[in-house]
Amino acid sequence: MKKIFLLISVILFIFPVQAQYTLRLMTYNIKNANGMDDICSFQRVANVINNASPDVVAIQEVDSMTCRSGQKYVLGEIAERTQMHAYFAPAIEFDGGKYGIGLLTKQVPLRLQAIPLPGREEARTLILAEFEDYIYCCTHLSLTEEDRMKSLEIVKSLIASYKKPLFLAGDMNAEPESDFIKELQKDFQILSNLEKHTYPAPDPKETIDYIAASKQNATGFAVISARVVNEPMASDHRPILVELRTAEKADKIFRTK
């Protein structure tokens, strides 16, 4: 890991005409804002996000217009409380509405794409958001290893043509020592801290949530910090926050329009 950080630092160093800025990536399985105290609170989830101050958040387990959520657009409720843009990708029809994943972003994406993924217990999906300088993907993978492996092949095929730094975030339903994570690491560098558990939130004993970077374009950034946010109550998962230092051309950093 030290060698990787040193290499990335060198890559940043050899661009003296570029400025540097930070990018804060987050992933959070919010359990539809239902906390461990059985209280549904959009504001509590929003507070967790606001305190972390991310640029983009991968959200898992979120309803849209379901009866159990009072026919509310849950992601929109949280977006309103965080002053972020909301993008929802349904995975299944559920309880009079839809259930799936989403993104919260400070910056409006240039392009969005939702891709169905296999899941024998329930359908899964991936949402890809392309920004000017990077790509952020959110997913919530199947409980079944075979489905996760098939999903990974779909993801790898999808991202092969992209040249920008690309990040994959979400609830992978697999622990670091699993065959799936070992396979994932062939093509992705995991940026989040594998030694810090994310589930269950009150007393985490498993690491099943991740933020990773595609190795094919893993240049121009360095990890400043990677942590699991200490939030035991708002959901059954704890969120992950990764902060990156990235190299950017000065004319983009200091643009006035």
Question: Model-derived features: where do they sit?
Answer:
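Beta-strand-turn-beta hairpins that frame and shape the catalytic cleft
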Residues: A19-M26, K106-L110, E122-C138, L244-A250
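Sec-exported extracytoplasmic/periplasmic mature domains
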Residues: N50-P54, A79-Q83, Y87, P109, ...
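Active-site-proximal beta-strand/loop segments in catalytic clefts of secreted hydrolases
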Residues: Y28-K31, Q60-V62, A89-I92, T105-Q107, ...
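Structured beta-strand-rich core segments of catalytic domains in phosphoester-bond hydrolases
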Residues: D37-D38, V62-Y134, G220, I224-N230
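N-terminal, active-site-proximal structural segment of metallo-dependent hydrolase catalytic domains
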Residues: V17-R81, E93-G97, E153, R245-K257
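Bacterial Sec-dependent N-terminal signal peptides
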Residues: M1-T22
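Metal-dependent phosphoester-hydrolase catalytic domains
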Residues: A114-I115, E145-M149, S157-F167, N173-K257
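Active-site beta-strand/loop signature of hydrolases that rely on acidic residues for catalysis
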Residues: L23-I30, V45-S69, Y136-T139, V155-I181, ...
